[in-house]
């Protein structure tokens, strides 16, 4: 019986987003793919483990979907949005309730400056209970900024920081905001 647990890996893209990898225990290739994604790798050799696992191993259900997510994460780290999109779609076709597939596809959309699509996917990830919601809130804040909704972005950066208090990325983003109260008449 193959088991899987969720883990995360943070990678900075041009949009500065956070990626969530899925740890898969099973075949050697799937395990190596999972480890590479979790360790923040994005090189071709690491991605090859994922491709081998998908092409040669008998992965079922969530393990197969998780391997697509991991390969998509590596592609996303390199800025290969089109290829990562295909992998996230493949994962969602197999496991439509896998929150990590939604959060990563949402990050991909944000990287492509398709902010509304990103927002929709990130909201879905949060609804499904993504394991590290701070990453979804951070990426959603980026989407809100892209949609010129600074107030919502501010609150999502705050929420990301509340969930992970020492995380530098939302701390840095919050430094750009100036919050003031409106002056009331009288």
Can you name each region flagged by the protein language model?
Residues 19-59:
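N-terminal leader/linker segments that initiate helical-solenoid repeat arrays
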Residues 52-55, 59, 90-93, 124-127, ...:
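Conserved structural position within tetratricopeptide repeats
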Residues 64, 98, 132-133, 167:
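Residue-level recognition of tetratricopeptide repeat
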Residues 77, 111-112, 146, 173-183:
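Register position in tetratricopeptide repeats
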